[in-house]
Amino acid sequence: MAVPALQEKNILLITGPEEYERLHVFPNTYPYVKEDSARILCFKLHEPIQITSVLKEFPRFMVKDFVKSVKGSDFPRFFDNSFSQKEFEHWMEVFYKYRGDLLTGGICIKEYLNLKKYDGKINEYRAFYANNEMISLEPNSGQETFSPAPPAQMLKKYQSVESPFYTVDYAELDDGSWKVIETGDGSVSGLSDRQDYRAFYRSLYLAFS
């Protein structure tokens, strides 16, 4: 249903279409988080990509569209100089097949980061921000609760991105530093597995009260 039709029914969206696109589509968010994010290169869908050119920018890189990757499949986690142009083009065909009708925006090439692991699990946290404050910070990769959390200064730095409700995913690198690895609109971002749902929605309610 279009926004004007919702307004006629006295239904007001917390997040408008422009704000949704700003946080849901990573290249739109990138200008806000690039100081603490992996570097990216963007291409049009089906635009030829020369792997040698990309490798001049990043020694290893991952592939996603403007919203999602195809992790959890047989698609390579990253590409490096061990891949030929022909092999890369084959895998791009696989990528397009796997994403299918869900392809969004274009192709986003992201610098591959070496992430810290604890007992085989990366140390990733998801922060929910609502009305310019962080309302939730939870482990988001199945790691144990004793793993270090992102620096408070970084968490505060991204509490005022131009959207009323969004998420930022943070991950610890091998050297102990932290990076922003993903962002999302709050309405389509999932809660962490062990998160207290009631406490989350209570905090969300209070943020907009």
Predicted regions, residues:
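Active-site and channel-lining beta-strand-loop segments
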Residues: 125-128, 169-171
